[in-house]
Amino acid sequence: MSKTIMDVSRWQGTIDWDEVKASGKVDGVMLRAMGNSADGKVSKPYIDPQFARNYAECTRVGLPVGVYGYFKAVNREQADKELAYFKKLLTGRSFELPVAVDIEDEVQKPLGKAALTGLTAYMLSTVESWGVYALLYTGLWFGNTFLCMGGAALKPYDVWLAAYRTRKPAPGWPFGMWQYTGTARVPGVSTNVDMSHAYKDYAAIIKRAGLGAVKGV
């Protein structure tokens, strides 16, 4: 049986997490920790304004938490800067769900499949080295067009696939989570919200493996 996972960011405003928990509609939450205003030339990651509150509140009410960062890196130097910033945001916190690298930006398209796939694999392996369960987030069209999905470089990592439709997609490569809508409604959230099916019990897997806590260097 799949788990229902909600993901939120600053765009959902101030959430009443007691209401979310009481609704019984959500088994876990993916929080945006890092946004990005990079233009392809200069890396400009920033903390999502709601991240600290959302993390504290989810922890308080007992909702399993994962996190994602929006990456716009187009080379290794930018990737290292964004990764360092992302890790700083996560250090000292623990996550029951995966830590996702979000790859879907316009500035990354000109790199070509091979280069962007290699850069993405590098970012995922770095995140994994922090002692968390690394996950790739991307859209169905973006993944098929700009990444070598199902290839050797990305094969070690689960995919969180965005494809808004009523039937489960069949892209020809495996994925562990499916973000199926951006217009769900959940008590306690004043806006539409993204919702996903998780086909693995990530909380159990992460706990069993002793993963999830991000420590400083």
Segments (PLM) and residue ranges:
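Catalytic domains of cell-wall/extracellular-matrix polysaccharide-remodeling enzymes
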Residues: 97-171
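Functionally critical loop-and-helix segments that line ligand-binding/catalytic clefts
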Residues: 1-19, 23, 27, 150-217
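Substrate-binding cleft of extracellular glycoside hydrolase catalytic domains
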Residues: 1-130
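Flexible, glycine-rich phosphate/dinucleotide-binding loops
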Residues: 37-38, 74, 143, 168, ...
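Sequence-level detector for tyrosine residue identity
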Residues: 46, 55, 68-70, 85, ...
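Low-complexity, flexible helical/coil segments
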Residues: 43, 66-70, 100-108, 136-138, ...
